[in-house]
């Protein structure tokens, strides 16, 4: 494996680079990490193409939630560019009918000038009960959501609605992988991570106890350590 690869962090829905602030300073890599742009796109493919264009040469996509969808799309588009992949609190299959209805409802709510209410609603599924009681984490998520804004939130939701099943992508990926999830994640439950780890030929599965959907904020050191362990395997 090449030693000059670039890690690319990919934020989730309604989130920014601050999602990975602890990991951006704690990652041990030969080249500085980059953060993909997930704004102003209504297509995961467009997000993935822009992320791949950030640098020349090998890359290590590391995505959380929607960022994981983008990471898998990067793997589908350019598997030869990847030296590894980190899939945090994410899923490889498209939404079922019930989840699609929920997603459409949040789009309508955001479009009706109730965007801040959407953010407050999402907090309950983003964070574990303990993290919901941590004012600093809640404030951080709310600040990221305000930065992303209503228009980008709607675009991102449409991008997610259009995502494909990445079963074949994962099954054919011949690079080291990390699949990580929180035990209290209700948006992408641990069962999804078990499925992805079973598909990836060279993967490590890590379920963080008592952690919710935003693992990089709730368990920053554990996530950083897991990412560094993946890098050591490359």
Each language-model region and where it sits:
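Short alpha-helix in the alpha/beta-hydrolase fold that links the catalytic acid
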Residues: 175, 189-198
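Catalytic histidine-centered segment of alpha/beta-hydrolase-like enzymes
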Residues: 211-224
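Gly/Ala-rich beta-loop-alpha elbow adjacent to hydrolase catalytic centers
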Residues: 63-67, 71
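Short beta-strand/loop motif that positions the catalytic acidic residue
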Residues: 173, 179-181, 185
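Flexible "cap/lid" loop of the alpha/beta hydrolase fold
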Residues: 76-77, 81-120
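Conserved HGGG/HGGXW glycine-rich cap/lid loop of the alpha/beta-hydrolase fold
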Residues: 1-45, 49, 64
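Conserved alpha/beta-hydrolase catalytic His-Asp/Glu region
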Residues: 95-98, 113-171
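Catalytic histidine neighborhood in serine/cysteine hydrolases
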Residues: 194-213
């Amino acid at each position: 494996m090449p030693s000059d690869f670039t890690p690319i962090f990919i934020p989730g829905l309604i989130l920014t680079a601050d999602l990975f602030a602890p990991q951006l300073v704690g990652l041990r890599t030969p080249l500085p990490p980059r953060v993909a742009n997930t704004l102003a796109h209504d297509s995961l493919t467009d997000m993935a193409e822009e992320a791949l264009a950030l640098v020349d040469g090998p890359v290590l996509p590391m995505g959380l939630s929607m960022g994981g969808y983008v990471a898998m799309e990067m793997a589908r588009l350019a598997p030869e560019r990847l030296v590894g992949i980190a899939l945090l609190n994410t899923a490889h299959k498209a939404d079922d009918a019930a989840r699609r209805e929920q997603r459409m409802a949040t789009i309508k709510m955001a479009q009706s000038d109730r965007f801040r209410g959407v953010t407050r609603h999402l907090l309950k599924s983003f964070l574990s009960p303990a993290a919901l009681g941590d004012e600093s984490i809640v404030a951080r998520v709310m600040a990221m959501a305000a930065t992303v804004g209503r228009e980008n939130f709607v675009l991102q939701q449409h991008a997610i609605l259009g995502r494909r099943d990445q079963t074949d992508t994962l099954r054919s990926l011949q690079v080291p992988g990390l699949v990580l999830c929180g035990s209290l994640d209700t948006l992408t439950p641990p069962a999804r991570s078990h499925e992805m780890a079973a598909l990836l030929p060279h993967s490590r599965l890590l379920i963080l106890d008592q952690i919710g959907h935003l693992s990089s904020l709730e368990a920053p050191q554990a996530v950083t350590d897991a990412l560094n362990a993946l890098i050591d395997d490359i």
